[in-house]
Amino acid sequence: MSDKVYTVQDYKSGQPRWCPGCGDHAFLNSLHKAMAELGVAPHNIAVISGIGCSSRLPYYVNTYGFHTIHGRAAAVATGAKVANPDLTIWPISGDGDGLAIGGNHFIHAVRRNIDLNMILLNNRIYGLTKGQYSPTSERGFVSKSSPYGTVEDPFHPAELAFGARGRFFARCIAVDGAASVEVLKAAANHKGASVVEVLQNCVIFNDGTHASVATKEGRAKNAIYLEHGKPMLFGENKEFGLMQEGFGLKVVKLGENGITEKDILIHDAHCQDNTLQLKLALMEGPDFPIALGVIREVEAPTYNDAVAEQIEEVKGKKKYHNFQELLMTNDTWEVK
């Protein structure tokens, strides 16, 4: 963190070229605010993207950035972090870019636990290429590439992250700026691979895809904000809660059948066993609320630290410590 106090303006760059009403606008505002509150100097940040609407984001942040090729944000970010561990790196991908052609890089970056703030902007559609179904589009979704409806099940980003032994998973919705800022800050402060799924709208090709939680009123009824150490309550007046039932979960109403707040599950984001956390991450309407906030956050050694330690260990055992020293051994000649 820098001694200088930064403002949102320090992180802004250029005029975003997205459709009016695109969820990318709201997310970008949250990212600017999160960066300002984190206080990391712009020259110590790199924003790295692949290809897609959301992948234009590096142009609109006044930091270092790479607009790479399709699906390769996590791969390039891995190299950048290992080469310069002091950088704060934000790989940003859409659901198509990150989970289709980039899916392999995504799961291995998570598995290796590289210290990256991995953002997945999920609007369940390919937007830049004008409306084809993506790996997160729902079964039966009608699009230009599935005119009669898709006949395949979608990926759940949480399931991929958890399956790759992810240590941090959080979810927010782009239009909820205050909550998004807090989630982004938590991701940045976590040491290791942080995966944040951002639910966002595509007003042109998949309008209303997250309609149930798109408004404040909708989120009160259909979403639950999880906070570590606090009871899992939701509803306009926090009148509903989550309890365990067998190996699953159930929604209960406080006051009915003698149920009180003491009966409600307490969220433990730091539990090493991810069984309950994954159940929370996979909840869907209409039977369950959609989980928002930090769902899982546990500590583990990072890949970039392990690589740096290994290099120092090997150098300590070798006569020559770098390539230049090796070149200058024995007889040398200077050609003029």
Please identify what each model-predicted range represents.
Residues S2-K4, S13-G14, I204-K336:
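Flexible, low-complexity linker and terminal segments
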Residues V5-I69:
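Active-site diphosphate/adenylate-binding microenvironment
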Residues G14, A41-I45, A83-I89, R111-N117, ...:
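Short coil/turn connectors at secondary-structure junctions
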Residues I51-C53, N123-I125, D176, L199-I204, ...:
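Glycine-rich beta-alpha junction loops
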Residues I51-G127:
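Thiamine diphosphate
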Residues D86, S134-A187:
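Conserved thiamine diphosphate
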Residues F168-Y225:
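ATP/pyrophosphate-binding catalytic subdomain of soluble kinases
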